[in-house]
Amino acid sequence: MSLGAKPFGEKKFIEIKGRRMAYIDEGTGDPILFQHGNPTSSYLWRNIMPHCAGLGRLIACDLIGMGDSDKLDPSGPERYTYAEHRDYLDALWEALDLGDRVVLVVHDWGSVLGFDWARRHRERVQGIAYMEAVTMPLEWADFPEQDRDLFQAFRSQAGEELVLQDNVFVEQVLPGLILRPLSEAEMAAYREPFLAAGEARRPTLSWPRQIPIAGTPADVVAIARDYAGWLSESPIPKLFINAEPGHLTTGRIRDFCRTWPNQTEITVAGAHFIQEDSPDEIGAAIAAFVRRLRPA
């Protein structure tokens, strides 16, 4: 299958809390739920989802303000908080009638949202596959040194110009954390939701300001602490897709999640957006994980 720019499946739309949200929903059976983070969309999973064809209902949602989902209006510095994203995604997942045998496949902010949802709906979770994830609250010392200054700038007033005007998260952070060069078609797909300067790009700025680092923001730190404690004891089957060299889930963060029970680990090539470097390896590992959970 390997690399390709063509999206997977057909975008569907549903009204959630007065806004139109976009998602992919292909196949039948118990769901395999793929959730992206910042600044991506369901497009991130296009070369991975085909590996799971025939294993269940393949769902990938675009977070509010991202991908083909509507922007929030009015917008501003107080919008697109973790809590607001969770409210919209919880409502969307509820509307999709996921049932009680859900396999979660999560990355980046999708991991925070997915781990949090799983802790709150543990009786409905069949398994969790995760990669480049926020496995616990962070300290700045955990954050990759080469990006520390930039992410601290995002959390200051300077972030407004860096992201809302210069589109740094899409133009610099995204391609900089992929080992291969993206094609023009691939970059165009990632740029498309954020072409207009200003508030259209607000989601990609609010997200780095919500990362649970050094005790801030307190609500997200508490959520990450709660799910970290739960995952470190939960018997729910887990697949940890480790990245080499990796970016976020390294060092202490990786050491911690490696202690989680009932877990399988594989390693693939990649920095942070590893779906763009190792889609076949990731897809094959997820498919094998699901087959173990759902023997024919």
From Swiss-Prot:
Catalyzes hydrolytic cleavage of carbon-halogen bonds in halogenated aliphatic compounds, leading to the formation of the corresponding primary alcohols, halide ions and protons. Is involved in the degradation of the important environmental pollutant gamma-hexachlorocyclohexane (gamma-HCH or lindane) as it also catalyzes conversion of 1,3,4,6-tetrachloro-1,4-cyclohexadiene (1,4-TCDN) to 2,5-dichloro-2,5-cyclohexadiene-1,4-diol (2,5-DDOL) via the intermediate 2,4,5-trichloro-2,5-cyclohexadiene-1-ol (2,4,5-DNOL). It comes from the Bacteria. It is found in: Periplasm. Signal peptide: none annotated. GO terms for molecular function: haloalkane dehalogenase activity. Pathway: Xenobiotic degradation; gamma-hexachlorocyclohexane degradation. GO terms for biological process: response to toxic substance. Keywords: Detoxification, Hydrolase, Periplasm. This is Haloalkane dehalogenase. The active site is at D108 (nucleophile), E132 (proton donor), H272 (proton acceptor). The gene is linB. It catalyses: 1-haloalkane + H2O = a halide anion + a primary alcohol + H(+); (3R,6R)-1,3,4,6-tetrachlorocyclohexa-1,4-diene + 2 H2O = 2,5-dichlorocyclohexa-2,5-dien-1,4-diol + 2 chloride + 2 H(+). Belongs to the haloalkane dehalogenase family. Type 2 subfamily. Monomer. One of its GO terms (cellular component) is periplasmic space. Residues 31-155 form the AB hydrolase-1 domain. InterPro entries: AB_hydrolase_1 (IPR000073), AB_hydrolase_fold (IPR029058), Epox_hydrolase-like (IPR000639), Haloalkane_dehalogenase_2 (IPR023594). Its EC number is 3.8.1.5.
